[in-house]
């Protein structure tokens, strides 16, 4: 569960390293987000020479959460960290590489480009 003010690691090479969640999109009083949800976030740490700079406000999709997500068969998928991928307005990633595994739930939310770039889909 990701909420307002949560810090997320960035799982791509867009230049951002850490994000601070400003808003979870999808409803006026939405409190929490899970895997596959889009958030508006501020870049808190960035690598020099990247596409995204520190202080930029970006949209990102959550790809890993510590709290995990429940699957149809009753199992849960959990990760060691909370991570997101910076995206454009057309839901395509701003970076060209994805680091670490991503959840299969992204396929249901039409993030096929992220799923195809990821080294492992769990």
From Swiss-Prot:
Gene Ontology terms, MF aspect: large ribosomal subunit rRNA binding; structural constituent of ribosome
InterPro entries (UniProt xref): Ribosomal_uL14, Ribosomal_uL14_bac-type, Ribosomal_uL14_CS, Ribosomal_uL14_sf
GO cellular component term of the entry, any: cytosolic large ribosomal subunit
Family annotation (CDD domains): Ribosomal_uL14
Pfam families, per database record: Ribosomal_L14
One BP term from GO: translation
Keywords for this protein: Ribonucleoprotein, Ribosomal protein, RNA-binding, rRNA-binding
Stated family: Belongs to the universal ribosomal protein uL14 family.
Biological role stated in the UniProt entry: Binds to 23S rRNA. Forms part of two intersubunit bridges in the 70S ribosome.
Subunit structure: Part of the 50S ribosomal subunit. Forms a cluster with proteins L3 and L19. In the 70S ribosome, L14 and L19 interact and together make contacts with the 16S rRNA in bridges B5 and B8.
Protein name: Large ribosomal subunit protein uL14
């Amino acid at each position: 569960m990701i909420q307002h003010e949560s810090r997320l690691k960035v799982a791509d090479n867009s230049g951002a390293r850490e994000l601070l969640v400003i808003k979870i999109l999808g409803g006026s009083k939405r409190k929490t987000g899970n895997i596959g949800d889009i958030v508006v976030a501020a870049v808190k740490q960035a690598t020099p020479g990247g596409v995204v700079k520190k202080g930029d406000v970006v949209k990102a999709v959550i790809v890993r959460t510590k709290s995990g997500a429940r699957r149809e068969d009753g199992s849960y998928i959990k990760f060691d960290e909370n991570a997101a991928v910076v995206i454009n307005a057309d839901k395509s990633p701003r970076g060209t590489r994805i680091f670490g595994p991503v959840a299969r739930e992204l396929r249901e939310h039409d993030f096929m480009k992220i799923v195809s770039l990821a080294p492992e889909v769990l």
